[in-house]
Amino acid sequence: MSNLTLGSLFDGSGGFPLAGMMAGITPIWASEIEPFPIRVTTKRIPHMKHYGDISKMNGGKIEPVDIITFGSPCQNLSLAGKREGLNGEKSSMFFEAIRVIKEMRESTNGEYPRWIVWENVPGAMSSSKGQDFRTVLEEICKIKDETVHIPMPEKKWTTAGEIVGNDYSVAYRILDAQYFGVPQRRRRIFLVADFAGECAGKVLFEIGRAHV
């Protein structure tokens, strides 16, 4: 694939757009509300548009992109917080991202985005006794298949997994930054969804295969 485009929700200082550029992907727009990170990305990626508050965005009225990335707020999912989960004021913003993605797909007859990438803290897997991560998986699968139901695991969520449906796939795993050139231990969940095929696992599991 070539000439892929990217939109970044909860953009922060532009980590996903910068990584995309390093892989030959063109960032088109971002959503962020904090002034300083916006200044950083405006200087670093001047061609990328900024749409501000995600709650005021309509995914059907912005430029369609191949990939939407989002590291939705983790404060209510983190082991360091009060753990209100997806019902918390900040982490419930996850559902705003789902809304924007659905709006874009509806306006493009399901063509865009084909891919999404979600990033969050490992605590998301245990928040609300694992129910929050089940909700994350189910809401993402429902972008393509409204009838899907994701069951809870018998014990707890594993550090990696894959769902393959009818012409879509979702894969997730925990990655540690220390194995990717960063001098610190920083474990995060990464989830890839492919809404037009079974390539999510191929994308996610081919990188750093030895380090889960």
What residue ranges belong to the model's regions?
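Conserved SAM/SAH-binding beta-strand->alpha-helix loop
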Residues: 34-35
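Class I S-adenosyl-L-methionine
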Residues: 57-65, 79-209
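Conserved SAM-binding strand-loop segment of SAM-dependent methyltransferases
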Residues: 47-53
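Short beta-strand element of Class I
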Residues: 27-28
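Class I SAM-dependent methyltransferase "Motif I" SAM/SAH-binding loop
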Residues: 8-14
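Conserved SAM-binding loop
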Residues: 41-42
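N-terminal Rossmann-like NAD(P) cofactor-binding module of classical short-chain dehydrogenase/reductase
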Residues: 67-69
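Extreme N-terminal starter segment of soluble prokaryotic enzymes
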Residues: 2-6
